[in-house]
Amino acid sequence: MATSHPLAAAAATSSSSATFRPPLRFLSSPPSSLTLNRRRSFPVVCAADADAKETTKKPTIPDKAPAAGSSFNQLLGIKGAKQETNIWKIRLQLTKPVTWPPLVWGVLCGAAASGNFHWTVEDVTKSIVCMLMSGPCLTGYTQTINDWYDRDIDAINEPYRPIPSGAISENEVITQIWVLLLGGLGLGALLDIWAGHDFPIIFYLALGGSLLSYIYSAPPLKLKQNGWIGNFALGASYIGLPWWAGQALFGTLTPDIVVLTCLYSIAGLGIAIVNDFKSIEGDRTLGLQSLPVAFGMETAKWICVGAIDITQLSVAAYLLSTGKLYYALALLGLTIPQVILQFQYFLKDPVKYDVKYQASAQPFFVFGLLVTALATSH
């Protein structure tokens, strides 16, 4: 599975999890004991035990690699990627750039909700740095560590991905994990100094999201083994954490916003479930209790759309109750097309139409997030 932090977070999605997975995807953070271990079953990563020769070994293409693949898919880190031997392209693939936009958007929503963002050079620059922390650094960290611990699943579902295929060595993967993590935390600390915070809230959001990402993917907790807890953690990483980071950067993170974004994270749970359907075979084989495995595809697809739709309708009702009539109507207007697309694609066949459904429905969802952010800023 792939995995969403204030940035990071969550997402993790296109690999064995899905496109929304682990997400400012402030997501996982490996402890200092993270090491590289060559055994097929790795509770931890043990760089110290890795053969030094692996760092210089050239990437290889498996004998059974697909005859053709898309270079574009490879760069985005999604299924159907072309086999690549360029180590930097492989590194980029592991970070799954396709999962960065939700985190970047979350930062934008948080900045809008603060009511204090201005189109000045300084504010725009600060927001870009926050987006870099949430997307390339912390989401990239989350996706890489998720792929590391998912290699057994990927060996079943997508055996030609970089790690199970041997296209990148163990030491190279571990190095990437630490560079992205430390880079993201460093940017978080820089943003706190830049914003003049007495308490380094952005740094701690990044640290917390990184830890969440780690326990999402790694044993012994491995939250993703539970469909409810894992997918909610993913939703929070992709929606809540980046929003909080953006709002804290330009304003004050208030309790009502925390509650509202946690509610929205339930919709993120539903979106994360979409990605579980394509991994049902590998999840069942390895004992992961994703919702499609636990409840069956028919029930799980209704849980999925229910989480997405009921959450947005609840937020619209909340906005209406606070006198934000036009914002509530706008959110309702953005929810209706999602329901139509669910019946048109997802509910018919969640495996066949998962990509088409997400590509067509998610734009309405993310604009609904922005509508909510603008409503709370007034």
Swiss-Prot record:
KW Chloroplast (keyword) present: yes
GO biological process, one term: chlorophyll biosynthetic process
Keywords: Chlorophyll biosynthesis, Chloroplast, Membrane, Plastid, Transferase, Transit peptide, Transmembrane, Transmembrane helix
Cofactor(s) essential for the protein: Mg(2+); Zn(2+); Mn(2+)
GO cellular component terms given for this protein: chloroplast membrane
Pfam families: UbiA
Activity regulation (UniProt): Inhibited by N-phenylmaleimide (NPM) and diacetyl.
Consequence recorded when altering residue 161 to H: Reduces activity by 99%
Transit peptide, start-end: 1-45
Keyword Repeat applies: no
CDD domains: PT_UbiA_chlorophyll
InterPro entries for this protein: Chl_synth, ChlG, Prenyltransferase_related, UbiA_prenyltransferase, UbiA_sf
Catalysed conversion reaction: phytyl diphosphate + chlorophyllide a + H(+) = chlorophyll a + diphosphate
Effect seen on changing residue 146 to A: Total loss of activity
Membrane spanning stretches: 173-193, 199-219, 232-252, 257-277, 302-322, 327-347, 357-377
E.C. no: 2.5.1.62
Domain topic, free-text comment: The N-terminal part (1-87) is not required for enzymatic activity. Amino acid residues 138-160 are probably part of the polyprenyl diphosphate-binding domain.
Protein name in UniProt: Chlorophyll synthase, chloroplastic
Species this protein is from: Avena sativa
Gene encoding the protein: CHLG
